[in-house]
Amino acid sequence: MSSPILFAIACLIWGSTFWAITLQLGDVAPAVSIVYRFGLASATLFSWCLLRGDRLRMPWKVQRWMMLQGVATFAISYVCTYTSEQYLVSALVAVLFVLMVFWTPICNRFMFGTPLTWRMWSAAAVSICGVILLFYEPISHAWNDILAGGSGHFLLGLGLALCATVTSTIGNVVVVKVREESSNVFLTMAWAMFWGTLAVASWALLTGVEFRLPSRPSYWAGLLYLSLFGSVIAFGAYFTLIHRIGSQKAVYIGVVTPVISVLLSIQLEHYRPGAMEWFGMVLCLSSVAWALKAPSPAKNEPSIPLESKLEAP
């Protein structure tokens, strides 16, 4: 399969996963949908690793990091993402996730001492301005709603979406430690998804969340799409693309996917951004593209894992 086709596959799948999450909402609690999704995804990845002849057992020094990655990325982050999409259109959540491009180097600075360049700081400042423009009017309306005695659920959704980007970034930074012990990406992903599934399932059971099987066909279509396409096939295309054209080019998938998410929201969720929102999105995405063109880090700096540069629900 050619590189342009692989690039298109990854962009289209990850760009549509934010909307596909909306198919999972309403029938059961978000935690239940997450357990179903990553339970199926991890089982698929484990099966694939077995077919390749991989040894599934991993030493404890690797498992402890995969547990942390799973809880941060596939548990807390996705619970926040799914819950936030109950209050925000999926396009807004997708645009917020590009902030991970800036959270990641900041986390690496604290954990590994990786220096931050002026270009990264400048791009982050532009991106923050874009986010402010994107959310200025919705936040104003939500605040007026609160003053009028309303619930202000939009602000809750915004806070949860931001929390999702931060916890997902933490999980991605932890991958640095995982990669030091194992280079088997699909096996470590399978274990991380397993631990994330176990964490969400345990929390759901302890809080009395009801587990049941929805009857709506679109729910199961969304589940299969998110589990198999969004969590397995897209990553396969992404890593193959990295091997062919390099991570510096493949990472631009992270700029294209929010655009696809916005177009889908306009078509399927009746999202109608105004001039200020469009300008905010352009600022945010262009700043990300600028940041991704920054020079590579010095040789003595710890490398950022390939999959930490891009993460999509």
Task: Label each residue range with its predicted role.
Residues 45, 104-106, 110, 141-208, ...:
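Transmembrane alpha-helical segments that form core, pore/gating elements
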